[in-house]
Amino acid sequence: MRVLVTGGTGYLGSTICRALTARGHAAVPFARSTGGDVRDRAALSRAAAGVDAIIHSAALVSVWRRRALDFDDINVGGLQNVLDVAREHQLRRVVYTSSFLAQAPAGRSTPLRANDYQRTKADALIVARRAADAGAPIVTIIPGVIFGPGLMSEGNLIGRMVADHLAGRLPGLVGPDKIWSFAWVENVADAHVDALEHGTPGAIIEAGGHNLPQRAPFEWLLQNRGTRLPRTLPYWAATVAGHLELTRARLTGGMPLLTPATVEIFRHDWPLRGGIGGTFEEQMAEMTR
């Protein structure tokens, strides 16, 4: 198949493009770095001419933006544009990249919606479900915390945290005992291609990995690289720091290192089903080579 990949030059998107090529498909990246913007429905429609399917991995992944509506325009409006274009061109399949943060954490029945990213990914999941109910050929993938080698972007949280720790720039961990689902980036990409080829329209597939404490990568570094464990930041101290960082960001236009909403996310466990591929130890070794 010829497949348009939104966000195709990003951390996950570029890995999806490679996975598509490896399976004999033709990947067509659509990304802002190459002149594509999911907010531009006309541009998206032009790019979709002649393709068989869309994998929609583009998203605004950030802890904060001065203009909160950017999250709505990209994360919710972008998905709606993809669905409209898929219907216009009568495409065979849409595979949508959601997020574990769009779902409820362990012990809750509703999504947390702590920050604008989480809020809009939860809203977009509702859009995806409604589209599926209306007959759209959409399959939704819900990855865990994606990690692995590659771009040090907002989407590569673990890679950035590990790099910061090794460089002495990581202040500490908030909620180190809380469970995350560490999902290897290549496995998540393969899950998208599986959904493209074999997924049932309307399905929501958890592409989880290893359900481990947040501190797990740093314990591996301690055992295999001899680094110290990061210190634990109490929730109250992290919340105060988050408020100070938000104030600084609003005054300077910079990006906060932490926000109170991020601290709230770190208070919860985020396990997923669907543990896929390889051992955590092997994956950490490859990521830190």
Residue spans of the language-model regions?
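Mid/C-terminal beta-alpha module of Rossmann-like enzyme folds, strongest
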Residues: 191-254, 280-289
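A conserved pocket-lining segment of Rossmann-fold NAD(P)-dependent short-chain dehydrogenase/reductase
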Residues: 161-183, 187
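Conserved beta-loop-beta element that borders a ligand/cofactor-binding pocket
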Residues: 126-149
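Conserved catalytic-site region of short-chain dehydrogenase/reductase
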Residues: 63, 99-107, 146-150, 155
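NAD(P)H-binding glycine-rich loop region in Rossmannoid oxidoreductase-like domains
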Residues: 36-77, 81, 85, 102-107
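N-terminal Rossmann NAD(P)H-binding glycine-rich loop of SDR-like oxidoreductase domains
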Residues: 3-23
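Short-chain dehydrogenase/reductase
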Residues: 70-76, 113-125, 151, 155-159, ...
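Conserved Rossmann-fold NAD(P)-dependent oxidoreductase catalytic core, especially the SDR/UDP-sugar
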Residues: 81-120, 139
